[in-house]
């Protein structure tokens, strides 16, 4: 929003200006001739500003005529025309209070400072020399300084009178913590805000140093009363801030001050939804800042739930309905804060997202509205066009609020009904007349109201109705009698049959089993109400699917799993599109249904269809994970592990959904799953490295330089070959280049070999530990030198020697698919050189063919389909027998072995074959080098992709990689033919 331009003064306001000039001149004349001369010397711009401010604000006119020296000083110091630096406003108030000896003087000096600062702030706001953010910041800083400096003045005097409060357990002096709530907490005070405060103290105990000890709570209650008295009462000097303490536990009937433990217990046991909403903006504004930070950290779990909390929308909707009823009852439709499309609706939109997602997305845990809107846009919660409209609408409403309040320094947001005040507001807002201003105001209110309804409104409600009655139609209401068993079984069966169910008896039994399950019987009333609202919607959408029986069979276990965490049911009730996606994905894949049932937090991914079916590329994946982890304290391992697991679960779901929908082909599916593993491994290694170095210090290389980390994670098998599937484990090998003869440089040094072994163990621990969100990956380390009996971590030299002198041919075959996934670049480059040297050495081809064939035969005998002699018997192509996509003849492993044989046989003459580790590109390399006929190379590539695609589909159906023997006839025969042509048996 561009700042409103200055407009010509309307005739109706000229009397205000004339009267202000006359009264001001009289006051200056009475003060001194020099004072009048000083005013006469003002530049034209300041004199115009004087007229504008006095035309708009009776309060400023009254203050400056009462104390003309105040405005002259503000003008002479240049403070009217410049922004304050950080701390400058507090410094002025501190100077003013330094001379106060009595509490009366404290109150008087605070009020005079408030009047001075208020005149300056209103002047700069009405003349648009300060933007909205600066005005709110100055007002909030004035409040912060007034509260804290008054407290700092009162506390030592209170201690002198009653003793110093001391913690019962810590034995240390206690200070009060003052929390600023609402607009004060968010640094968004308006021109005539009251201040919402909560007082607290760290722990119980009693005062020391006086004859009669006071309980700590009694001490702080009395101190709080003195602080309120210093700020709130209206005297001949005015007031500082109206103090509202009703946001404390139990409101006006509760104790004025509570201990940290009492506060935590209250919010844990009795905290209400509106109190979560209020706590979003809580900020320590005075007293013990360090203790205050600890208190806010204690209360964070109450405000921000670790799971998605769509119940917050219900709470905000209820609050809004109560506000609407009050607005209607009191005739406050013209209230720009509480009325439709007002300031509160913009705040509700932002806070709805904060309460729902803030427990998992730490970037939303902030107070200022503009910052939250920016984050909502940046994180993809709202489109930029929406956040821009909300920003502009909010600015317009807040400027209007300030114009209203500047008139008389009154806390009101009602549009005036008299022509003079209407003209004042139109002038300040830059409009020629009230009608033009009001038209623009109503435009912004309509836009805000529309966006509010999109986010907050009940999905069953009529968007044109501000207040709903009990006659509204409930989505899925026709299924409510069936769920509540208010119709007989025959009628219920007929309803299901007519809707498309096949086995109506099974469907009714499934619903009955759900109703009688232990999870549901022990549900609280609110959770049961949410379930009863959700099931009819579920049935209404299930019958839209081709196979509603299958949908119900797969989704009801999820419903039972989340029933007691009913916020998830609210999520699906509030988001019909998310429910639709859930049913579609569960119908397509029992694997997805099981994943979501085990980890309901995945429901969040269904909210954004564009994101669900568009998984990010490798750099974006890595950046997103880094951004998530950087918001978590380095010492909070539990949260880091949960964040890693949620990241993996979410992106695995997105890849599976994209594969099912057909938006991702097979090769891209494997690419994404492999990139996901690489991003996770990169961060896991970083976490393990930081932990290990913190405990033992850093190991050294043979040249004396420090390792950083001097360690690589090498991927074999599917992850090495960029062919990960759903649920694949990771074949890993760890290699380092540390000096085995030295120790680490920390306070608790250990030798380098032990350090790297522990580092490897830490990596495995982070990957495999089961948490509430499962594990990241199963890890297989058996491909390391000497297998399970070998060292967990090998030095680069030991690895090279083993591969050169001891490794079996099958280990060299495995090395064909090995590549560095993460770690030190220089160690990775040395590994690649070792790999190239080992794979590219001269080999006897007859011996190589025999060894490759022998290993393949062993695998077929042990792992293939025995009924068909691993696909080689005469019955192997019959529909009644199974075909193992991976292990049977003509399948995946045959193609992999041919590729590995070719790489070992010909890479000495054709080193380009070693550039890639995936089978498809190695086959392309064999074709380009003329080592494999074009037709055969193409056949192998297409067969390989077809097999893997079928295996992926089987995995998503939670089935083994086995299909009927009548499938893939042509591919199997061609693979077997090429196998034989290569001389393999």
UniProtKB/Swiss-Prot annotation:
Pfam families: GlnD_UR_UTase, GlnE. It comes from the Bacteria. GO terms for biological process: regulation of glutamine family amino acid metabolic process. Keywords: ATP-binding, Magnesium, Multifunctional enzyme, Nucleotide-binding, Nucleotidyltransferase, Transferase. It is an enzyme of class 2 (transferase). One of its GO terms (molecular function) is magnesium ion binding. Residues 476-985 are annotated as: Adenylyl transferase. It catalyses: [glutamine synthetase]-O(4)-(5'-adenylyl)-L-tyrosine + phosphate = [glutamine synthetase]-L-tyrosine + ADP; [glutamine synthetase]-L-tyrosine + ATP = [glutamine synthetase]-O(4)-(5'-adenylyl)-L-tyrosine + diphosphate. Its EC number is 2.7.7.89, 2.7.7.42. One of its GO terms (cellular component) is cytosol. Gene3D superfamilies: 1.20.120.1510, Beta Polymerase, domain 2, Nucleotidyltransferases domain 2. Signal peptide: none annotated. Residues 1-460 are annotated as: Adenylyl removase. The keyword RNA-binding does not apply. Disulfide bonds: none annotated. PANTHER family: BIFUNCTIONAL GLUTAMINE SYNTHETASE ADENYLYLTRANSFERASE_ADENYLYL-REMOVING ENZYME, GLUTAMINE SYNTHETASE ADENYLYLTRANSFERASE. HAMAP family: GlnE (MF_00802). Involved in the regulation of glutamine synthetase GlnA, a key enzyme in the process to assimilate ammonia. When cellular nitrogen levels are high, the C-terminal adenylyl transferase (AT) inactivates GlnA by covalent transfer of an adenylyl group from ATP to specific tyrosine residue of GlnA, thus reducing its activity. Conversely, when nitrogen levels are low, the N-terminal adenylyl removase (AR) activates GlnA by removing the adenylyl group by phosphorolysis, increasing its activity. Belongs to the GlnE family. This is Bifunctional glutamine synthetase adenylyltransferase/adenylyl-removing enzyme. It comes from Pseudomonas syringae pv. tomato (strain ATCC BAA-871 / DC3000).
